[in-house]
Amino acid sequence: MSTLETTRAELGLVVVYLNKAEARDKICRAIQYGSKFLSDGQPGTAQNVDKNTSLARKVFRLFKFVNDLHALISPVPKGTPLPLVLLGKSKNALLSTFLFLDQIVWLGRTGIYKDKERAEILGRISLFCWMGSSVCTSLVEVGELGRLSASIKKLEKEIGNKDKHQNEQYRAKVEKSNERSLALIKAGMDVVVAFGLLQLAPKKVTPRVTGAFGFASSLISCYQLLPSHPKSKMV
């Protein structure tokens, strides 16, 4: 590829990435929690950025609860153990509830919904739902990693003395295992973030700790949404 073609391809990936509403939301999330880390809960510019970005992000999530509602009623892959099915459906139900209630919180903060006290209560309930969905996600990922580990070990025995890294199926399973490990780390971080937003342990999970974990999990989300890099042509 020429330099111009390479640059055009790279910019094309950026355009594809930024065209995703989810990607823009996660970039804003990184800004939000980065500002929370800098402010440490103290009044000032950083705290204003945190609050304003948090409100702006809610617009990205309007009607997003439908996605998890659809996943809730969709069939699961055959062979999935019942405990993982139940945990997965619980995650969908809790996340859908969080996103639905979050819309009422947005209406309250914009002044459309007048009962501010009820909006605040619903806001706390929504955060508990999000924390619950993150816990369910963590447990699902642990279970799926266990299944993948057993599958990889079985495949290693079948491959025998051959170079396992040359086996396409083996590489795919290892890549999937890495993806699930990253998802597990992110879900664990999100539990801490929810804990901090709910102020369940304000002395330990301070706004700065919440901001640090939220910023890190946002970067992971941004990475997970990256489009696949086009393979360069061999001459």
Swiss-Prot record:
The chain crosses the membrane at residues 92-108, 207-226. It is found in: Peroxisome membrane. Expressed in roots and developing siliques. GO terms for molecular function: identical protein binding. Induction: Up-regulated during senescence. Residues 109-206 are lumenal. InterPro entries: PEX11. One of its GO terms (biological process) is peroxisome organization. Keywords: Membrane, Peroxisome, Peroxisome biogenesis, Transmembrane, Transmembrane helix. The keyword Cytoplasm does not apply. GO terms for cellular component: extracellular region; peroxisomal membrane; peroxisome; plasmodesma. Residues 1-91, 227-235 are cytoplasmic. It is a multi-pass membrane protein. Belongs to the peroxin-11 family. Homooligomer. Interacts with ARC5 and FIS1B on peroxisomes. Can complement the yeast pex11 null mutant. Involved in peroxisomal proliferation. Promotes peroxisomal duplication, aggregation or elongation without fission. This is Peroxisomal membrane protein 11C. It comes from Arabidopsis thaliana (Mouse-ear cress).
